[in-house]
Amino acid sequence: AMGLDIRINGEFVPGAESWVNLSLLSVRESLNDVKHLRREIGAMESEEADKVPRPTDRLMNLSMFFQDYLPSNKNFKMHVNFSVGTGLPFGLKDNNEVYRNTYRFKPYHRVDLGFAYQLWDSTWKNKNPRHPMRFTEKAWLSLEVFNLMDVLNQASNTWVKTITNQQFAIPNYLSSRRINLRVKFDF
């Protein structure tokens, strides 16, 4: 296994953190006394492979997070989170050692969008000593849309066998678009 993980943190505007993360990974294996074969989907012939990818071999992952606020009201923030990565490997069912992890899922990609409004900050106590949230340090109300583009990212397969002993892979997908409303209190 080997990899490289690079992260750059910064602020496009003061007080609003942003970052870019790039990961390059390689996790390969070779089982003793097993001749590994690789075959592309739809191909009739196989080719020999010295090493095959392990189930966690995601070759590349790129994530970006950007945050901003309204210049006239720093209590209102917005953020965008973007992730893209190569697909994870998978193989045929039944712990197949010869054709081990020869295929890959489609690339993973997702965009999240969020808006947040600061309801209270303890530094405001002098201005508003009777505020209902004065017992907290900070209070935020946020609305987030996860998987904004409603992408169907495949997580795994459920294998179904027919009476003629053929196997079919039925995809299992990660969550679709979700809307999240949250109230956060810091004490």
Feature annotation, model-predicted:
Residues V27-R39, G114-N128:
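Short regulatory "switch" loops immediately downstream of catalytic or recognition motifs
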Residues Y103-D112, F187:
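Outer-membrane beta-barrel transmembrane domain signature
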Residues S83-K93, Y117-F187:
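C-terminal beta-signal and adjacent terminal beta-strands/loops
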Residues A1-L92:
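Gram-negative outer-membrane beta-barrel transporters
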Residues M2, T56-L62, P107-V111, E137, ...:
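Residues that define the transmembrane beta-barrel architecture of outer-membrane proteins
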Residues K51-P55, R100-R104, R130, A169-N172:
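Outer-membrane beta-barrel domain signature
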